[in-house]
Regions:
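Membrane-embedded alpha-helical bundles of multi-pass enzymes
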Residues: 2-227, 494, 505-508, 519-520, ...
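Class I S-adenosylmethionine
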Residues: 215-217, 256, 484
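A generic fold-level signal
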Residues: 36, 158, 235, 328, ...
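Short, conserved active-site loops that position catalytic residues or coordinate cofactors/metal ions
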Residues: 34-51, 76, 81, 244-245, ...
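CN hydrolase (nitrilase-like) catalytic-core segments centered on the catalytic cysteine
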Residues: 99-102, 129, 277-278, 283-285, ...
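Active-site catalytic loop in hydrolytic enzyme cores
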Residues: 84-90, 137-169, 353-469, 558-587, ...
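Soluble catalytic regions of membrane-associated enzymes that act on cell-envelope
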Residues: 220-416, 450-455, 459-476, 501, ...
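Residues at the C-termini of beta-strands that transition into short coil/loop
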Residues: 154, 244-246, 337, 375, ...
């Protein structure tokens, strides 16, 4: 077999200093490229040192090859996800080790294939196919941790990946690795390229990056008219209020009186004025609401009574400049809740992998991390014999419409113990974040489920689920016209964790071309438009001066409200002063006006969004078909470049 470029690179000399640089450099580059750092384009060269290490490993032992690459991958994981330590030290160590080992698999398999005599493909392009398969699989097993999916890196540059509505994050991963391969080969072709300018040497990777940037700008412009419906006579405005109660999950959330917390959050919700839907964060209702009779729960009953009595009509006087789609009647609510499902079982073993036995051995129960959708309804009864003569009416509370969804993408180690069906002893190793919240394997929905009615259905995305683009697609297929993320991000303290989590929601907005509204108990609450632009956001513990690391809001209510008469430049300036980003793309300022109020230490963010039932190419294809297209493309490139013996 003739010598090829891949064979020649094996002769490159690797001294100790070069090896050390290649081990530590990827961690530095990925740290600078990942949110919240602002140097995202560095991902286009961050993998080049890994390719150098892989080339060095071809001429050394398996042990040395694994050790060096594993160390480099571990440093990458530490530099970008070290903050998991604040939630669980044991969990963080296990995650870092396991994730680094899994990342090594594409390298190890590529090395094994290259050593086979029958191997005739270009190893680098084949490596991309293997990495794509690794990412796809890592989204779909019991120890799933796709936080460092390469395509997530562009959450800091949403303007560049408007084409995610076609490919999703897998397309971003393929682009990043392809550019890295081209950069690597340009660097390795020293003899033929030494006398060329760097622009000529790197013209192909630069050209590809530029083409995707231009494509993104064009797609963004096309989507902008649709997103804000500038040319449509049929607008569907929908006003949403997102609450950020700022309860410390360790010292307050599961310790304070649940009913008092509900009353406080209801009062904060009232301050926001009229709304179509009110959004409360994950586990806002902490008393394990019975799946069989949620309307009978004291907290749920209180909320329905509260909004039947204090609906938007009572709050509209102070907000006459705001238009919203619900003319009268109480708003719907989407609220995070702990739920419990009781059932009897006298058979052998456990009735379900998530089942727990009560003190009465006949009865079992399953705990859930859930989202409740509540639509209070008013039952009107006339007083007197003739209801048609404008006689005084009295209202009585009806149960209303209550729907719920149980979180399906569970956090490994805390909400789901891996492989407990075959290794049941692992159930005892559950990591508890605190002494009151549920741990161990939780019950879950079999599929994603949109909640609500008709054209205003919502995707109830609970915390960890928001990093799964393909799973979010299932909500939209079920009829969701907007995305709600309810979460509690304070487990990680004030670290990059909650910022990355918020930023990933921008990618979900682009993939589905849907508005995203985020309600965080602590962390970042806000609104993201279908182009991935943040139109309004809060800060870490914003409203609690003793905890907030950002500029605190003025204590006056409605300080964040801007009327239609104010200029866009003034809005941007004032919102930036508050530490809040605002987008100026809304066609009708009265409909899109943002408002933020503060009651005590709690915040209420409100804005009018536009609903749509549009399904993107990504939503229709799904990760499976996109993976097949990308892997086939990489295999063809691998074959072509090996046969041509050059790039």
């Amino acid at each position: 077999m003739e010598a090829t470029q891949n064979d020649r690179t094996a002769d490159v000399k690797f001294n100790r200093l070069k090896l050390i640089v290649c081990v530590f450099l990827p961690a530095l580059l990925f740290w600078l490229a990942w949110e919240p750092m602002p140097f995202t384009p560095l991902v286009f060269i961050a993998f080049v040192p890994f390719f150098y290490l892989a080339e060095w490993g071809r001429s050394t032992s398996k042990g040395k090859n694994f050790g060096v690459l594993f160390l480099a991958l571990m440093l990458w994981n530490i530099s970008t996800t070290w903050w998991v330590w604040f939630a669980s030290d044991v969990g963080a160590i296990a995650m870092l080790i396991l994730n680094s080992m899994l990342m090594y698999l594409p390298f190890g398999l590529s090395r094994w294939l290259q050593r086979k005599k029958w191997f005739i493909w270009d190893a680098k392009w084949l490596f991309i196919a293997l990495w794509l398969l690794y990412e796809y699989g890592h989204h779909r097993w019991d120890l799933s941790w796709p936080w460092l999916t390469l395509g997530n890196a562009f959450s800091g540059m949403p303007w560049y990946v408007q084409w995610y509505e076609i490919t999703g994050t897998l397309g971003g991963t393929a682009l990043i690795l392809s550019v890295n391969v081209l950069v690597y080969h340009a660097l390795m072709n020293d003899q033929s390229n030494a006398k060329r300018s760097w622009i000529m040497r790197f013209r192909l990777p630069i050209g590809i990056v530029s083409v995707f940037g231009i494509l993104s700008v064009l797609l963004g412009q096309l989507a902008s008219d649709f997103v804000y419906q500038k040319k449509s006579k049929l607008k569907q405005p929908y006003r949403v209020v997102a609450i950020q109660p700022n309860y410390d999950p360790y010292d307050e959330k599961f310790v304070l009186d649940p009913m008092q917390m509900v009353r406080d959050m209801a009062k904060t919700s009232d301050s926001a004025g009229p709304a179509d839907c009110i959004l409360w964060p994950e586990t806002s209702l902490v008393g394990n609401i019975d799946v069989g009779s949620p309307a009978q729960d004291m907290q749920v009953s209180y909320l329905m009574h509260h909004w039947l009595k204090n609906g938007p009509a009572d709050n509209a006087a102070g907000d006459s400049s705001l238009n919203h789609s619900r003319a009268a009647g109480p708003p719907s609510m989407l609220i995070g809740s702990n739920m419990i499902h009781w059932y009897s079982w006298m058979g052998k073993g456990k009735p379900d992998v998530a089942a727990r036995q009560s003190s009465n051995l006949e009865y079992w129960y399953t705990l859930h991390n859930s989202a409740l959708w509540i639509q209070p309804e008013l039952s009107i009864h006339p007083i007197g014999s003739d209801p048609f003569k404008h006689e005084r009416l009295r209202g009585s509370m009806a149960t209303g419409d209550i729907q719920f969804y149980h979180k399906s993408k569970l956090v490994p180690g805390t909400e789901q113990l891996p492989f407990v069906t075959v290794l049941p002893f692992l159930e005892r190793l559950a990591i508890s974040l605190d002494e009151n919240s549920a741990s161990g394997t939780l019950g879950k929905n079999a599929t994603a489920k949109a909640l609500g009615v008709s054209n205003s259905k919502v995707a109830p995305i609970i915390c960890y689920e928001s990093i799964y683009g393909d799973y979010v697609s299932e909500y939209v297929k079920d009829g969701a016209s907007w995305l709600a993320v309810i979460t509690n991000d304070a487990w990680w303290n004030n670290t990059p964790g909650h910022k990355q989590h918020f930023s990933y929601a921008k990618l979900r907005a682009i993939e589905q071309r849907k508005w995203v509204v985020r309600s965080a108990n602590t962390g970042i609450s806000g609104f993201i438009d279908p182009l991935g632009n943040t139109t309004m956001r809060s800060g870490w513990y914003q409203g609690r001066d003793e905890r907030s690391a950002e500029v605190a809001l003025n204590k006056h209510l409605d300080d964040g409200f801007f009327s239609a008469g104010e200029s866009g430049s003034k809005r941007s300036y004032e919102w930036n002063i508050l530490g809040i980003k605002y987008g100026n793309k809304l066609e009708d300022n009265s409909l899109g006006a943002t408002k933020i109020t503060q009651v005590g230490t709690q915040l209420a963010l409100s804005q009018t969004i536009y609903l749509n039932q549009y399904r993107t190419v990504y939503n229709r294809l799904g990760d499976g078909k996109i993976l097949a297209i990308l892997v086939l493309s990489m295999l063809l490139l691998s074959w072509f470049n090996r046969k041509q013996k050059q790039f």
